[in-house]
Swiss-Prot record:
This protein's name: Methyltransferase/ribosomally synthesized type I borosin cyclic peptide precursor cmiMA
Residue segments, region Methyltransferase domain: 1-253
Function comment: Fusion protein of the methyltransferase cmiM and a type I borosin core peptide; part of the gene cluster that mediates the biosynthesis of a type I borosin, a highly methylated cyclic peptide with potent biological activities. Type I borosins derive from the C-terminus of the fusion protein, and it is the same protein that methylates its own C-terminus using S-adenosyl methionine (SAM). The C-terminus is subsequently cleaved off and macrocyclized by a prolyloligopeptidase to give the final product.
Residues recorded as bearing N-methylphenylalanine in the entry: 381, 383
């Protein structure tokens, strides 16, 4: 498949514009836009649209493919084909889609799958989703007790399981049961909303809290994070606040007790019961005896033997920056790694060797004092307490 994809000239890159206007576009996404033959986009605001057109004047808005007399699925098929036609013409096509381009986005996955099956090079670059914004604004770590994400209608239609002991995120709560498209939905058209509330009440009870969340689009706005009980969401004045871009966050029920696998804990050599850390454990304190002791030790801390600082000077840093941000430079590198490295000045032999090899262990090690490959374990940063220590 790799050989076949390189045999055809056209290629497809899908990127996300994020949620916040302009500022959520990654450097990688902007670089892809600038270097595309044509950009096809569906974004949420005019400022982002204008920014895309500024970066690449040959840009086309796919939003016009929506129609109030069409099913959304038909529109998504057309959006995918609009990009694929140009890929088949041999063009370097970039599709820009609101949020993360692979999260609750149908045409991107369709286009990528078809492009790859036809032998074209196709890839997706990550972007920021509404859920990423929700985690940041509400201060939630999904790893604390686990997290499940559903589309609201999907939850109901397929009777998806709800785990009250974990975080729950629900998308598209403002258009429950809607498969058509309108340019201007109103809250009174969300006639199946109570069906969603019935499902939540069944799992959590009427007094359990739900946070109604909307991420800010422009820097002039603040996030909307309104907490209601499930019962309150049935009130007309509250229900009317739910829009097409609304997301629900449902916290775990604090009454749910953790179930431990005693046999497994023993096999791991853990003699105590794991606990949920602060701030996710309402019974924990931010400055208990353990926390105070760790903070006291901070004053006398010295970098451990295994720590390797970044080199003060390295020609490899500038090279990697170019490879990250300039697709044409990356193309030259891929054509002949050895010739590319030999043509560069200011690199040590170790740095050249690392560049030719190209794997993360060798490259990461070449940027650090010592020049030796980095242990893979050192590349994994686990900031959440495992509950086993």
């Amino acid at each position: 498949m790799i050989g076949a994809s390189l045999a055809k000239k056209g290629q497809l890159t899908i990127v996300g514009s994020g949620i916040a206007s302009i500022s959520h576009l990654t450097l990688q996404a902007v670089s892809a836009i600038e270097n595309a033959d044509i950009v096809c986009y569906v974004v949420a605001d005019g400022a982002t649209e204008a920014f895309i057109r500024k970066k690449n004047p040959n840009s086309l808005d796919l939003y016009h493919l929506y129609g109030e007399d069409k099913q959304r699925t038909d529109t998504y098929i057309q959006m995918a084909e609009f990009m694929l036609i140009r890929v088949r013409q041999g063009q370097n096509v970039v599709g820009v889609f609101y949020g993360h381009p692979g999260v609750f986005v149908c045409p991107t996955h369709r286009a990528l799958y078809i492009a790859r099956s036809e032998g074209y090079k196709a890839r997706m670059l990550p972007g920021l989703s509404a859920e990423d914004c929700l985690f940041a604004d509400l201060g939630i770590d999904p790893s604390s007790v686990g997290c499940v994400t559903y589309e609201a209608t999907d939850l109901l239609v397929f009777k998806r399981p709800i785990n009250p002991a974990s975080h729950l995120v629900l998308y598209q709560v403002g258009i429950v049961g809607k498969s058509n498209f309108k340019f201007d939905y109103t809250s009174d058209e969300n006639i199946h909303f109570t069906k969603l509330l019935d499902r939540l009440e069944e799992a959590y009870g009427p007094e359990h809290s739900v946070t109604h969340y909307i991420a800010p689009l422009f820097p002039t706005e603040d996030p909307i994070a309104e907490e209601y009980t499930i019962a309150q969401l049935r009130l007309p004045e509250i229900r009317d606040k739910i829009h097409t871009i609304s997301t629900f966050y449902v916290p775990p029920k604090t009454s749910e007790s953790l179930i431990y696998d005693e046999v497994l804990l023993a096999s791991l050599g853990v003699t105590h019961k794991p606990s949920v850390p602060y701030p996710w454990n309402p019974e924990a304190t931010p400055y208990g005896p353990r926390e105070k002791k760790a903070i006291e030790l901070l004053a006398e801390h010295e970098p451990p033997k295994g720590y390797r600082p970044l080199k003060e000077r390295s020609g490899l840093l500038a090279v990697l920056e170019k490879l990250c941000l300039e697709p044409l430079e990356m193309k030259k590198y891929n054509e002949d790694r050895q010739a590319y490295a030999d043509g560069l000045k200011g690199l040590t032999e170790n740095e050249k060797e690392a560049l030719v090899k190209g794997d993360h262990r060798t490259l990461a090690g070449a940027l650090k004092v010592g020049d030796t490959p980095t242990n893979p374990a050192a590349l994994v940063f686990t900031f959440i307490i495992t509950r086993l220590d």
